[in-house]
Amino acid sequence: FETEDGPINVPVTFLCSGFGVVENPDHVIGSSLRRSNSLLYLIGHTEDEMGGSVFARTHGVEDGKVPQTDCAANMELYKAYYSALTSGLVLSAHDISEGGLAVTAAEMAFSGKGGVRLDLTKVPTVNGWKSPAVPLFSESTGRILVEVDPEFAADFETAMDGFPCACIGSVTEEKRLTATCCCLLYTSPSP
């Protein structure tokens, strides 16, 4: 691509798209928050897998474990999630990928329906982590942040029984992103 300042080269990028038949359009949901006072569930494990992440690049971290993907485990997790979705238990959902949980929560809140309060001590993990940056910015694969109406919380938890799933927060009326981890608290500045 040529500009006045010279050429701009786009790095080679692998893109994989999937297509399928939507049997029931009522099962199609968006990624924007739907209402305040709803609950936020994280499905999938968050591990200390910061290698190659946006956080690592931004902070000059050159080592760190690169996220590993367990396709078989993720498929079973997604089947349980799909069952909850098609049962009408999910208001909205967003995959957690580049930028981690913090970026995903912020993207969901862009709808203007409210803010997000997260309790990082509730984030599902197998091996834990030493830094509060990990649950916020890890790019562990296979995870989804799911908005659920409190009325359907018990049903959603039943649908996800046996899988890594925890209520890690809620949607607030105040348009802020707040994350707590033990005694640490971070609140985004007012808009």
Where are these regions (language model features)?
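Phosphate/diphosphate-binding loops
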Residues: 1-46, 127-174
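Beta-strand->loop->alpha-helix junctions that form or flank phosphate-binding loops
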Residues: 96-97, 108, 114-126, 157-182
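Short, Lys/Arg- and Gly-enriched loop/turn segments at beta-strand edges
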Residues: 47-54
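Gly-rich Lys/Arg/Thr-decorated short loops/hinges at beta-loop-alpha junctions or inter-strand turns
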Residues: 54-66
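Conserved small/polar residues in nucleotide/adenosyl-binding loops
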Residues: 186-191
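Short, surface-exposed amphipathic charged segments that create phosphate/polyanion-binding patches used
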Residues: 134-136, 180-184
